[in-house]
A protein has these predicted regions:
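Membrane-proximal envelope and lipid/glycan-remodeling enzymes
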Residues: 1-531
């Protein structure tokens, strides 16, 4: 009897799912539940076309005249970084094996990318974010809350599941943060991780370069302060960087005839557009920070709260403690990007929720968030409010407010600027989301639009995607009639309930566990009880 009594806890502990895995599974289900099942931007379509061109042996040349650069021989290439097209290739290859029509294969590829590839990349970014916080000495619970704050309490959530490249850039920043956090603990093998993060970011978007320059400067400063790593570690880090940059320059030369020609120059020259418009700098810089249209702090108010807390109540901890270099870096990277983007012709990033080009930067605020959640009592309430706010960003397509904006201006209903709240997502989303929920429950699908049908913005807003919840089960119900609307809502609700249960269980296990594993590796073993790893 005694032996059986002792055996039972041991067996249950072996069957226990590590809380980190539960948390990450909750993130994945959240991103899947709120995905539309398709792309919400033309950028993603161009990247898919590039991946398809590779598989067809055309070397990346595509037929679209929009947002492409034309070479002297008449071919057209996307001028975006190639990495997101690379990660689309497996889904596209699987879809091409299906015994269905070509159009169905294309839709299947989009479905796989938005429900599998994109959510997994976002979860991976958050996993390394959590690992970085643990290496910085933040407790499991505070690390978990900070990771939830980044993943669901900022504009990251919107871009984590819509097909844009922001989550892939965020993965690069997260890898860098993880590597540097290891290096701050005198672990020289953090440097290759940091180098890999920079490679991921620059291979995804050329405009990540200003951020990476600041991050590289901090990395070098830390190396000078801590002492240089061994030659083999430096060699591996340098090889990753050199190989990536060399590959990108070679791909540029193949596409556009010169290693330093990314395609942006050709595109702007062809369209006779100015790349930078410095005379608009002041207004657009302010708009990027606090405007209803694209204000970084209005679309992620939790980050505004943590900065107020840091400067008013916790300067010594945040800016003079062990994580001070990373906290200062987050502010520097934000400032550099605002200066750079505010003069850029397409500073607003096109369709999207808030300032798209700043979405990946929220990863860098994770250390500051971790410190806050360890020290304040109001953190849980602020986190709940932030998540509720961001839920509005995933109820409707990313293009919703832009269509509403164009429709209002074209009909003369109003004049829209960056400071007109009535033309912005932050003011339009609550009412439009509530209307979409009512229509979904009542079975009012709105107008069905034929594939590739061209309509005015005010007519597009009457379609099912904008009149009902933009979640893939609901879209399958209203657009393809594959299930009853209540079955679709039950499926979505089940995913939400599973998400809540998984995340609740993760934090429950952390609360019941023995003292946190100090400086744990980014591994599931770090979450097992002492003696089990």
């Amino acid at each position: 009897m005694t032996s059986m009594t002792h055996a039972a806890p041991s067996r249950s502990s072996r069957l226990r799912i590590p809380p980190l895995l539960l948390l990450l599974a909750g993130f994945w289900l959240t991103f899947v539940a709120t995905s539309s099942g398709g792309f919400e931007s033309s950028d993603a379509e161009l990247r898919l076309a590039t991946a398809s061109s590779w598989l067809e042996g055309r070397g990346g040349a595509i037929d679209s005249p929009s947002l492409t650069a034309r070479t002297p021989d008449g071919r057209r290439f996307s001028f975006y970084g190639p990495l997101q097209s690379v990660v689309m290739v497996p889904s596209l290859a699987v879809a091409k094996l299906l015994p269905v029509s070509e159009a169905t294969r294309d839709n299947a590829a989009r479905f796989l990318i938005t429900l599998v590839t994109q959510p997994l990349l976002s979860v991976l970014a958050l996993a390394f974010c959590f690992g970085a916080l643990r290496h910085l000495g933040v407790s499991n619970i505070a690390s978990g809350k900070a990771t939830v704050a980044v993943g669901l309490g900022t504009l990251f959530w919107h871009y984590a599941r819509m097909g844009q490249e922001e989550n892939l850039v965020a993965l690069g920043f997260s890898l860098w943060l993880y590597g540097v956090s290891r290096y701050l603990k005198k672990d020289e093998w953090g440097l290759p991780w940091a180098a890999l993060g920079g490679c991921v970011a620059i291979a995804t978007r050329w405009a990540a370069a200003p951020s990476l320059l600041v991050m590289a400067a901090l990395t070098v400063a830390l190396m000078v302060r801590n002492g240089w790593a061994r030659a083999k570690v430096l060699a591996l880090s340098a090889a990753l960087c050199a190989g990536t940059v060399g590959g990108l320059l070679g791909y540029n030369a193949y596409r556009f005839g010169h290693p330093l020609e990314t395609g942006y120059g050709l595109y702007f020259q062809d369209k006779q557009l100015a790349f930078f418009v410095p005379e608009r700098w002041a207004d657009q810089a302010a708009a990027l920070l606090v405007s209803p249209y694209r204000g970084f702090f209005l679309y992620s108010p939790l980050l505004a709260a943590v900065l107020v807390w840091a400067f008013v109540r916790a300067r010594a901890v945040v800016f003079r403690g062990p994580t001070a270099p990373l906290n200062v870096l987050a502010l520097l990277v934000l400032a550099v990007n605002v200066v750079f983007l505010s003069s850029y012709s397409f500073w607003d990033g096109g369709f999207g929720w808030g300032p798209r080009f700043l979405a990946a930067l929220v990863i860098l605020f994770a250390p500051m968030l971790g410190l806050m959640f360890e020290r304040v009592r109001w953190g849980n309430g602020a986190l709940a409010l932030a998540v509720a706010t961001q839920l509005l960003s995933v109820t409707l397509p990313a293009t919703t407010e832009n269509h509403a904006r164009v429709a209002a201006v074209s009909t003369g209903a109003r004049t829209c600027t960056s400071w007109t709240c009535g033309c912005s997502a932050i003011c339009l989303r609550p009412g439009m989301s509530l209307n979409a929920l009512r229509n979904t429950l009542a079975g009012r699908p709105g107008k069905l639009i034929a594939p590739r049908e061209t309509l005015a913005p005010d007519q597009i807003l009457l379609s099912s995607d904008y009149q009902t919840l933009n979640w893939w089960p609901v879209r399958l119900s209203f657009r393809m009639h594959l299930m009853h609307r209540f079955v679709a809502l039950a499926l979505s609700g089940t995913l939400w309930v599973l998400t809540a249960l998984l995340m609740w269980q993760a934090f429950r296990q952390w609360r019941r566990a023995s003292p946190a594993h100090e400086g744990g590796e980014l591994s599931l073993a770090a979450d097992f009880p002492p003696g089990r790893h």
